[in-house]
């Protein structure tokens, strides 16, 4: 129990291992060189802070980083959890950020890296009103991707999304300076949503609803829909050719 301004700090490598739960609500766990946490559950709500000047490895069954919780690493971050709750929380890495979970809830949350972000959610990734940014690349794999309510998926480099379904309505945005590749086995709902690429844009889906939505690219734009394509009030635009 490290609640309410509690402080666990190591000048070198900080290792916290417990078979039970780690309660860090409003507390701080700091590794000045490296931080490793293993627990059944980690409660980092209420402005709890886990930080490392080096790498950060977290492996838990349940991670609650909501309500202002912060996970901050200046180098690589590896996070494995069965369930990750980052609603109104922040996860920030200075180098590669690798997230693996069954369920990721990032509503109104912020997940970012100045390097590459790889996120895998085995059941669902909910980014409604949230932001996931990988400056050097963003790679997301999940059956169900929710990015409505002005959710943002962005990268200065390439952005790749592989899913069964993508819901990007209500001002949702996928943005990249290099290229966007969206591959969907099922539906793509882009009503009043946007995909904006300064490079290529490739979209494959079973069916596409782009009512009031925008698919635009400075490079080649390729849209493949096995079923219906509804573009009523929508826009498909490319500076380099449309197919």
Regions inferred by a protein language model and the residue ranges of each:
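Well-ordered beta-strand segments characteristic of repetitive beta-sheet solenoids
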Residues: 1, 8, 12-19, 33-40, ...
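Short, T/G/N/S-enriched strand-turn elements that build extracellular solenoid repeat scaffolds
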Residues: 3-8, 24-30, 45-51, 66-72, ...
């Amino acid at each position: 129990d490290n609640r309410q301004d509690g402080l666990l700090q190591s000048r070198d490598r900080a290792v916290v291992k417990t078979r039970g739960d780690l309660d860090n609500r409003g507390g701080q766990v700091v590794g000045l060189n490296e931080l490793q946490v293993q627990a059944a559950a980690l409660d980092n709500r209420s402005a709890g802070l886990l930080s490392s000047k080096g790498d950060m490895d977290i492996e838990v069954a349940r991670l609650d980083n909501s309500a202002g919780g912060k996970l901050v690493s200046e180098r690589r971050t590896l996070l494995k959890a069965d369930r990750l709750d980052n609603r109104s929380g922040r996860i920030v890495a200075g180098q590669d950020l690798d997230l693996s979970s069954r369920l990721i809830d990032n509503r109104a949350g912020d997940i970012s890296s100045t390097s590459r972000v790889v996120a895998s959610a085995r059941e669902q990734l909910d980014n409604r009103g949230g932001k996931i940014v990988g400056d050097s690349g963003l790679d997301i794999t999940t059956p169900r991707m929710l990015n409505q309510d002005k959710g943002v998926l962005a990268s200065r480099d390439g952005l790749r999304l592989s899913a069964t379904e993508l819901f990007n309505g209500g001002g949702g945005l996928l943005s990249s300076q290099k290229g966007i590749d969206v591959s969907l086995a099922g539906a793509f709902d882009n009503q009043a949503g946007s995909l904006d690429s300064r490079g290529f844009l490739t979209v494959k889906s079973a069916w596409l609803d782009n009512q009031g939505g925008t698919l635009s690219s400075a490079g080649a734009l390729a849209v493949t829909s096995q079923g219906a394509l509804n573009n009523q009030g929508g826009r498909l635009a490319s500076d380099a050719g449309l197919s």
